[in-house]
Design a protein with these regions (language model features):
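Carbohydrate-binding surfaces of carbohydrate-active enzymes
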Residues: 2-136
Length: 136
């Protein structure tokens, strides 16, 4: 396959092992080459049984976990929170407040700066697995 991406929306109590397995599955589909984390929410989802706001730092942790497992890009949905339909309850980089003076925006800005600094060392990296898991 030329391009592999996936959307990661774990619950706030998700196991880091399950998340790692999902990233590894995507990397495996690309023969060990990097994949793209196409969507994750910077704050809350609108469809979990409990839509808790992510604790400070958790979005950064999960983003670095994706990079450590082979993601060349870590993206977020959505940029600006919707004003209608069900996605008005889904988190966004810019909340209904309409400005960047929020914890979520500041955390994302910091994450972007950090990833920019390490990008030359992480983009395109490959990791050869020492074991295999049959996933059927």
């Amino acid at each position: 396959m030329d391009f592999i991406s996936w959307d990661s929306y774990p619950s706030v109590d998700a196991s880091s092992g399950q998340m790692a397995l999902n990233h590894e599955l995507m990397r495996g589909l690309k023969q060990g080459k990097p994949f793209v984390l196409m969507e994750q929410t910077p704050s809350v989802t609108n469809w979990q049984p409990y839509n808790e706001l992510k604790r400070p730092g958790i979005m950064r942790l999960w983003s670095y976990q994706a990079v450590a497992h082979g993601a060349d890009a870590v993206m977020f949905f959505q940029m600006r929170r919707s004003i209608g339909a069900c996605e008005k309850y889904h988190g966004a980089v810019i909340d209904h407040a309409g400005h960047e003076n929020t914890r979520v925006f500041r955390e994302l800005a910091t994450l972007g700066q950090e990833l920019d600094k390490i990008g030359e060392r992480t983009l395109g990296t490959r990791e050869m697995a020492e074991c295999a898991i049959v996933f059927d």
